Amino acid sequence: MNADEWFAPQSLSKMVDIACDTAADIVLPTVSLDRYDAHRERHSRVLDAAHISIDSKSSMVAGLPQLILGGLVAQTSGVMYSRPLFEACLSRGKAYRTVEFMAYALSQARFVSGCGDACFHAVAPKLTDAFDPTMYARISDDTRALDELADSLSEADSGGRLKLASQKFYFAGLVACIENLCLSPHGVSSIERSARMRDMLEAPRTRQMVAALKDNHRGLGLLFGPIASAKPARCVMCTHLAAFLNRTGAKTA
């Protein structure tokens, strides 16, 4: 846990109770992503873990898309692992508190449970505060880990739900990278910004995602078209337009 992360009262004991009662290898709390306004009032986005129960490959295929698309798979702090599973992940060289660690743990777990009554508080990501030149590399690594998990379950996933969830995870991460590049204060020149944008848009993983989602992109927002056409200038324009519409409360999808 980081210094600005915390459990609500009794949350940890409730997670321990679930782990003991169900012999769960992984217990996921509900996560509250908090931000504070100028008046120090808290505004939260809640990722609910109440309905998570995975005890087989078929239930993994059914439940994992919810973890991915709901955002919980990326919330790697505050998760409870059994000691044998935790040590197995470390022995494979998986870095703790990464999606890679979480994905490998999910692939090895016999039972995964959510604890809706436990709430873990974390600071909501602030994409526009500062430019992060390593962000795209992390998103790529995270998606690769989810792709590998989906591949390991491909026989049970005849409908391709995990692959689709992984594609949408990558799209959301790519949009976040574009927003960080376009909207954060930084000293990056317009030439470098365009070069970074083009590298992301022309990356093989991006083109794979576009091909996979071209017939299933409803609801993905303004940026799918510019990303699909690999036009950096259009991406910049639509990013600023989406930010303006979000501030005014208008819909962008």
Model-derived regions, located:
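Catalytic core of nucleotide-sugar-dependent glycosyltransferases
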Residues: D117-K126, F131-S158, A176, N180-T206
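Catalytic metal- and UDP-sugar-binding loop of GT-A-like glycosyltransferases, i.e.
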Residues: M1-A3
